[in-house]
Swiss-Prot record:
Belongs to the 11S seed storage protein (globulins) family. GO terms for molecular function: nutrient reservoir activity. The keyword Ribosomal protein does not apply. Signal peptide: none annotated. Seed storage protein. The keyword Methyltransferase does not apply. Hexamer; each subunit is composed of an acidic and a basic chain derived from a single precursor and linked by a disulfide bond. This is Globulin 1. Keywords: Disulfide bond, Seed storage protein, Storage protein.
């Protein structure tokens, strides 16, 4: 969900 997208943003 949103958390998954947030993690992707943090990695990038």
């Amino acid at each position: 969900g949103l958390e998954e997208t947030y993690c992707s943003m943090k990695i990038k």
